[in-house]
UniProtKB/Swiss-Prot annotation:
Keyword Ion transport assigned: no
Family the UniProt entry places it in: Belongs to the eukaryotic ribosomal protein eS24 family.
Superkingdom of origin: Archaea
HAMAP family xrefs: Ribosomal_eS24
GO biological process: translation
Species in which this protein is naturally found: Methanosarcina acetivorans (strain ATCC 35395 / DSM 2834 / JCM 12185 / C2A)
Keywords annotated in UniProt: Ribonucleoprotein, Ribosomal protein
PANTHER family tied to this protein: 40S RIBOSOMAL PROTEIN S24
The name this protein goes by in its record: Small ribosomal subunit protein eS24
Molecular function GO labels: structural constituent of ribosome
GO CC annotations on file: ribonucleoprotein complex; ribosome
Alphabetized InterPro entries for the sequence: Nucleotide-bd_a/b_plait_sf, Ribosomal_eS24, Ribosomal_eS24_CS, Ribosomal_uL23/eL15/eS24_sf
């Protein structure tokens, strides 16, 4: 799986970076968590502050386009983001808690 960043914008008003990216892959579509982990490693960003807003795959293509945000702090992220988006992008410790329940 290769990720290429198309656009990297710093939004100082909301205290975050906004990224447009393309994921190229072979075989099945990678999961949101796989893309999130790889993107966090590429950007040297904490995983808990990285939100993937959307990933869209064209029919029959081996690539997906996406939009992600990297916040400077968790308080601002919780203030700005909608609840369903936060549930799609859980913190690493929260995933283990949900699996145990």
């Amino acid at each position: 799986m290769d990720i290429k960043i198309l656009k990297d914008k710093n939004n100082s008003l909301l205290n975050r970076r906004e990224l447009d990216f393309v994921v190229k892959y072979e075989g099945s579509t990678p999961s949101r968590s796989d893309v999130r982990n790889k993107l966090a490693a590429m950007l040297n960003a904490p995983l808990e502050l990285l939100i993937i807003q959307r990933i869209k795959t064209e029919y029959g293509m081996q690539e997906s386009k996406g939009y992600a945000k990297v916040y400077a702090d968790e308080a601002r992220m919780k203030q700005v983001e909608q609840e369903y988006i936060l549930k799609r992008n859980p913190a690493p410790g929260a995933e283990a808690e949900e699996e145990e329940a």
